[in-house]
């Protein structure tokens, strides 16, 4: 009978390097994507509502900036676009602040593609929009 020696050590090392490490990186990358995607939607809804109540997009900008800071994001990692303006170009659209008007905001949040313990690699902008109507019977004075 021949002496058969196994290759379990080599197979284990290859399995960890080829299968486990990429799977772990994929799982770790899902958390920030999910968190920041939810942040974009919530920031869009809250900032649009704040702008409608205060009749000012500046108030909406402040609400979104505060939410960004609460999540520990750099201010450059979130951008807003009001009433059709592109967030990437400054986002200062003109929103009509009259009864029955619709105020729309688009929020973009930077999401890293891969998150490792040593830092983030790559990234994409996740975008969410929300529209809020100004009440027809509200006092504007």
Where are these regions (language model features)?
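Alpha-helical assembly-interface signal, strongest on the long, hydrophobic N-terminal helix that forms
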Residues: 1-65
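Short, conserved structural patches
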Residues: 53-141
